[in-house]
């Protein structure tokens, strides 16, 4: 609500009718890139692969997601600087799935997204129990990360 409207609404409350408001509230705005048109899944720019973005501006939502994207972007910036192939984590991992989401050009109305099980690839078998399903997704992610360690000669 705009400031005059906030004053009007709050003043309708009998106990606040004569209150003096020192500061009114402001709405949080989330500014973000149209990442599918701008970024690759390694968090580098399509137009200039030497520039990396990370965090909320890329369209990942959440502290952990923003931090993880920063780690991947930072690792990839160093790898690019040293002429080493950049890493995109597997889609079975949450940050890998998010990095693919932000770079997916088929997404027409791009909106930020946080970590959620729905962006991971479906499991081969249906598992009804939520904890069991989460454990299976976790095992798949760890298996996929082992392959990354081999593919990119990481120890």
Regions found by a protein language model. Name each.
Residues 6, 71-74, 142:
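Short, hydrophobic/amphipathic alpha-helical packing segments
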């Amino acid at each position: 609500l705009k400031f005059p409207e906030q004053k009007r609404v709050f003043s309708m409350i009998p106990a606040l009718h004569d209150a003096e408001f020192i500061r009114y509230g402001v709405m949080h705005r989330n500014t973000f890139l149209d990442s599918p048109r701008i970024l690759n899944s390694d968090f580098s720019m399509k137009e200039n692969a030497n520039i990396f973005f990370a965090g909320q501006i890329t369209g990942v939502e959440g502290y952990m997601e923003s931090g993880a994207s920063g780690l991947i972007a930072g690792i990839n910036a160093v790898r690019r600087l040293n002429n080493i192939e950049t890493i995109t984590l597997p889609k079975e991992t949450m940050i890998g799935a998010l990095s693919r989401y932000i770079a997916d050009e088929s997404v027409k109305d791009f909106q930020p997204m946080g970590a959620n099980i729905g962006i991971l690839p479906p499991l081969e078998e249906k598992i009804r129990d939520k904890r069991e399903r989460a454990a299976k997704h976790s095992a798949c992610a760890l298996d996929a990360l082992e392959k990354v360690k081999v593919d990119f000669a990481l120890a």
